[in-house]
Regions:
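Transmembrane beta-strands of outer-membrane beta-barrel proteins
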Residues: 220-222, 251-255, 280-284, 325-329, ...
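Short loop/turn motifs that connect adjacent beta-strands in outer-membrane beta-barrel proteins
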Residues: 247-252, 276-282, 318-325, 362-371, ...
Length: 573
């Protein structure tokens, strides 16, 4: 059958080059990458301001302090308090030093997360050489939560839900509870907030005031890049619109469109909304891609489409200024169709559930830095709905139909070194239970991978990607804005098929199932406020190119050059 012959030839060519056949699964992944349409970074996360701090007393007559008595403590271990105070007993202390002792004890409460706690010296604080210290641990008084809200972006009921879900009246205020409250509200689209803690009516109590500030109801970005597929158009134009809190509940509508012209078009629509004040969100999205292959496949009239319907739940297990852990569950159905004028009908349906955990943590190790991570487990089923010839081809070769599982991981570290110098290291990868459909594979090549190679130069059922760069930031430039220059090295390893079959690498028996690509180069990122970002990257191939055509020496983009240049511009509004 002519169809089988052409399909076998195409697959053999694909295997000989160790590159993925340009089908809907591969092209869909090029557009699906959410790094293309993240919103502009928001300003620094605020923290609660504290009013009512007591100034130090003036220097007074020194008093001999034999010991200490602490009243009102229920939170700190006695051993911790003794360790702090024992260094000051058995000697004379001035009035200023007495207050410094109280401040040192208050700092211990702050370190433990009780940042509304206060330590006071009562009148006649020293009796028979024993200094009395009164601790007020800073509980939130009854009816101690208040807020101001313009109301155009967020209903008062919604603000109250977040406050009451995370702050408890009558209980001691902690850094974790206050930060979580503020940040969960700031995570809501269309609003920001400022907060203040001030003394309550009772001694040792506190009140919490939140001020809601409104942001634009519509925001978004327009972007242009050359990140697209060689076969469907490398130059692309995209736009993303965020409709923030249209129902005044903290919900959001996201609309994105990307086109490379007549050869590929992609659209994405998402709606997400909070389900409760504890940060739980739910959402649904739908997207659609259509394409037509160009270059050497133009004569085949090779076309296809892909569309996914997805629902998800997301929850912040930990939300703070320095430590975050988020969990998410996605349930989706992806439908893929590929056809040409030679009888190819490669229709597939992929049902999948994915469980993911991601987060970040900043610290002051070796100066300061941020660690990022993401772990994901996906379980799914591939149904082949194409014609009998395509089903037979899959059954006799890669056998992707049926259940599958994959595990993805990513770890990254942004580390400040000194002054304007920093470094970024990342390691990501994938493991699979069996041979995967092209839409589920691990891709290597392109601006966010091994940049010396075309987008998606190779794909594997399993793979690993290592990236390291050194960055230097320039500020107050003559043309305004800030510039970050970097040099990088990246290496990717791919196992093309989890399980090979007889003749899988025909007509190139020298082809190995394990491929490694390396690249080094330099790049820049120029930003002007939070309005415009311009990125450029030049990657050179390091070592041999195991993916090149053995006859022409060309990669999948039809070029034999050993470097690739990438450019992206994003305008935020």
């Amino acid at each position: 059958m002519r169809f089988l012959l052409l399909l076998a030839m195409a697959t053999a060519t694909c295997n000989a080059l160790a590159t993925p056949y340009p089908d809907s699964g591969r092209i869909y992944r090029d557009f699906k990458d959410d790094s293309f349409f993240k919103p502009a970074p928001r300003r620094d996360e605020p923290k609660a301001e504290i009013e009512g701090a007591t100034p130090l007393a003036a220097e007074g007559e020194a008093i001999f302090v034999q010991g200490f008595e602490v009243h009102g403590n229920t939170l700190l271990p006695e051993e911790r308090i003794h360790a702090i105070l024992s260094a000051h007993q058995g000697r004379e202390l001035s009035g200023l030093e007495l207050h410094q002792v109280a401040e040192e004890l208050a700092a211990a409460y702050l370190d433990a997360g009780y940042f509304a706690a206060r330590v006071y010296l009562p009148p006649q604080a020293v009796t028979n050489g024993v200094l009395q210290l009164h601790v007020y641990e800073g509980f939130l008084e009854e009816d101690g939560i208040a807020f101001t809200n313009p109301g155009a972006r967020l209903q008062d009921e919604q603000v109250h839900s977040f406050l009451s879900s995370n702050l408890s009246e009558g209980e001691v205020l902690t850094v974790e509870a206050v930060e979580r409250t503020i940040l969960l509200i700031n995570d809501l689209p269309g609003v920001n907030s400022r907060s203040t803690l001030y003394p309550g009516e009772e001694v040792g109590s506190a009140r919490f005031l939140l001020q809601i500030e409104e942001e634009p109801s519509i925001s978004g970005n327009i972007d242009a890049d050359n990140f697209g597929s060689y076969y469907t158009g490398e130059e692309r134009l995209g736009a993303t619109i965020y409709i923030n809190s249209p129902s005044r509940r903290g919900d959001q509508v996201v609309v994105r469109a990307v086109t490379s012209g007549s050869d590929s078009n992609y659209g994405y629509v998402e709606y997400n909304t909070p389900l409760s004040g504890n940060g739980l969100r739910a959402g649904v999205s739908v997207d659609y891609l259509d394409y037509e292959l160009g270059k050497q496949y133009r004569s085949l009239d090779a076309t296809g489409n892909a569309g996914e319907l997805r629902g998800f739940l997301a929850y912040p297990f930990l939300r703070g200024r320095h430590f975050n852990v988020f969990g998410q569950v996605d349930v989706s159905r992806l439908e893929l169709e590929d056809s040409n004028n030679s009888g190819l009908e490669a229709d597939r349906t992929i049902d999948k559930v994915e469980f993911s955990l991601h987060g970040d943590h900043d610290d002051d190790h070796w100066a300061d830095g941020v660690t990022y991570y993401r772990l994901a487990v996906a379980l799914g089923d591939v149904g082949i709905n194409g014609n009998d010839a395509f089903k037979a081809f899959d059954d006799q070769n890669s056998e992707t139909e049926g259940g599958f599982g994959r595990f993805n991981y990513e770890f990254a570290r942004l580390q400040h070194i000194q002054g304007n110098l920093s470094t970024f290291l990342s390691l990501s990868g994938q493991f699979a239970s069996q041979n995967l459909d092209s839409s589920q594979k691990f891709f290597i090549g392109g601006p966010f991978s091994v940049a010396g190679y075309p987008t998606g130069e190779i794909s594997g059922d399993e793979g690993t990607l290592l990236h390291a760069d050194l960055r230097y930031d320039f500020y107050n430039l003559p043309w305004r804005g800030n510039l970050q220059a970097s040099v990088f090295y990246a290496a990717g390893w791919a196992k093309l098929f989890k399980d090979t079959w007889s003749g899988w690498n025909d007509p190139n028996p020298e082809l190995d199932n394990h491929i490694m690509l390396q690249s080094a180069g330099f790049g820049f990122t120029q930003t002007w406020d939070e309005t415009f970002v311009l990125r450029g990257l030049l990657g050179y191939q390091v070592g041999s190119n195991e993916t090149e055509d053995p006859d022409s020496g060309e990669a999948t983009d039809g070029s034999s050059k050993n470097y690739r240049a990438w450019v992206q511009g994003i305008y935020y509004f």
